[in-house]
């Protein structure tokens, strides 16, 4: 379960309970994109907890009475599939394992097999807060990114695209792992607190 506190309008290697599968990089784009914007920036705090499936269902039933369900939930939540990038020596992974105060994750995220675009995202840990920036890219450009070809980012006018290109190109980022799971989300009516349940987690050990 993840509880987040957003200041404006989430997993990489957090997969201790993940079941390893054989999803290949090309299969990554057999993926639902929520209503997307071209660039979105969010500052928030996150608190994460492990729980059993029984506990999840019990708490979910309680939240049904006091919070709003995400419009995309459906009967069993919605699917999320993310391809994570890292340097050759897995610097971002090691920074997380070492618990560094300043660290980042770069990922390509898609929610729907029929989607014609994906979200390129960078999450940066800054003390107790996280900053997440997202850029909408076309399906064709997303495929190029899965092949380690980043020049397609140069066609986007936003400085975030240029930042990602420079970082991923100069520091030799490569596709590293795919994480897929189902998410059920709740939103508080009174404020911007969001509670999500992630389950049925699967991941590749390496791309």
Where are these regions (language model features)?
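Phosphate-end processing signature that detects enzymes handling 5′-triphosphorylated RNA
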Residues: 2, 12-15, 22-207
